[in-house]
A protein has these predicted regions:
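Short coil-to-beta-strand transition motifs
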Residues: 2-3, 42-52
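Short linear motifs in intrinsically disordered
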Residues: 25-32, 50-55
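Short beta-rich binding modules
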Residues: 10, 39-44, 54-57
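Short coil-to-beta transition motif at edge beta-strands of beta-rich domains
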Residues: 28-43
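Mixed-charge, Lys/Arg-rich low-complexity intrinsically disordered regions
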Residues: 3-30
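Short, compact, well-ordered microdomains
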Residues: 47-82
């Protein structure tokens, strides 16, 4: 049986100060917590990159082992396991 994913974009949720998963402009996940895993689409390599959401006082929210942090997260194509 293949793994099922929900795919959408990252968006900042000002109600809880977290980045969440938007699908068709609706919150599928209203906010990720530190340590939650997801995949981010790398347009240059044309592949999914596994990562996790974290937060630091210096750079705010960021994706581990990527260059994405802070407002750079807005609009990224991501997927999460169902």
């Amino acid at each position: 049986m293949s793994t099922q994913y929900t795919t959408g974009i990252l968006g900042y949720n000002s109600h809880n100060d977290r980045y969440g998963l938007l699908v068709c402009d609706l919150w599928e996940i209203d906010g990720f917590h530190c340590g939650e895993t997801l995949d981010v689409w790398d347009y240059d390599k044309e592949q999914w990159i596994p990562t996790r959401m974290e937060m630091s006082w210096n750079k705010g929210w960021y994706l581990v082992d990527t260059n994405y942090c802070g407002s750079d997260l807005e609009g990224l194509r991501v997927r999460v396991r169902q």
